[in-house]
Amino acid sequence: MTHQTHAYHMVNPSPWPLTGALSALLMTSGLTMWFHFNSTILLMLGLTTNMLTMYQWWRDIIRESTFQGHHTPVVQKGLRYGMILFIISEVLFFTGFFWAFYHSSLAPTPELGGCWPPTGIHPLNPLEVPLLNTSVLLASGVSITWAHHSLMEGHRNHMLQALFITIALGVYFTLLQASEYYEAPFTISDGVYGSTFFVATGFHGLHVIIGSTFLIVCFFRQLKFHFTSSHHFGFEAAAWYWHFVDVVWLFLYVSIYWWGS
């Protein structure tokens, strides 16, 4: 290997982009097979290969950053820009759901009874489980900030405690959301109200699960002393993502649960 005279990371050839693309093909084909032929074999194969690809790709990134020192300040800056752009793309993703909700609710069609919520729909009480969920996520936003500041100040045990609390609150939120779905008096097939409600809150719930997984990985990495007060972009990205999930929920709560009811 020749001597490197720049701060950029020249990535070694990797099989994971190819396996990731093939797993995406398997998943989309599997969804089609599931919808039309009620067969989930291809979908399960696609999900399994996708999970394995993500695990091994991120494992390689951790090796490159933590053990090989390839993530110089310049590389970290690029990763930060990448994470910011990813979160912006997620904002636009959720914008579509809010657009659908407000388009349907501000000018309800005569077929819905000319009112919102549509005739026959009994919306959930925003002052019960949804308000508890809001409190849980706001508390998790405080604890993740506590964890971040503890890490920057070198208080490892405090960081682990705060991160564990955040993960526990994330799991609690997911369980509350699942119980709310189970007890909801309407379904995703109950017109535009049901579809916009379950798609918007369901995708948010998926993002909470992804964010919780992200934080669990950071917890185990911190147990192995992977983060320092000056080199912890993996945790920083997880914290940014969690704050994004928090903010999206506040908009969902105000729009769909409170105003929409």
UniProtKB/Swiss-Prot annotation:
PROSITE patterns: COX3. Pfam families: COX3. Residues 1-15, 67-72, 153-155, 224-232 are mitochondrial matrix. Its EC number is 7.1.1.9. Keywords: Membrane, Mitochondrion, Mitochondrion inner membrane, Translocase, Transmembrane, Transmembrane helix. The keyword Ion transport does not apply. One of its GO terms (biological process) is mitochondrial electron transport, cytochrome c to oxygen. It catalyses: 4 Fe(II)-[cytochrome c] + O2 + 8 H(+)(in) = 4 Fe(III)-[cytochrome c] + 2 H2O + 4 H(+)(out). Residues 35-40, 106-128, 184-190, 257-261 are mitochondrial intermembrane. InterPro entries: Cyt_c/ubiquinol_Oxase_su3 (IPR024791), Cyt_c_oxase_su3_dom (IPR033945), Cyt_c_oxidase-like_su3 (IPR000298), Cyt_c_oxidase_su3-like_sf (IPR035973), Cyt_c_oxidase_su3_a-hlx (IPR013833). The keyword rRNA processing does not apply. It is a multi-pass membrane protein. Its main location: mitochondrion. Component of the cytochrome c oxidase, the last enzyme in the mitochondrial electron transport chain which drives oxidative phosphorylation. The respiratory chain contains 3 multisubunit complexes succinate dehydrogenase (complex II, CII), ubiquinol-cytochrome c oxidoreductase (cytochrome b-c1 complex, complex III, CIII) and cytochrome c oxidase (complex IV, CIV), that cooperate to transfer electrons derived from NADH and succinate to molecular oxygen, creating an electrochemical gradient over the inner membrane that drives transmembrane transport and the ATP synthase. This is Cytochrome c oxidase subunit 3. It comes from Tragelaphus strepsiceros (Greater kudu). The gene is MT-CO3.
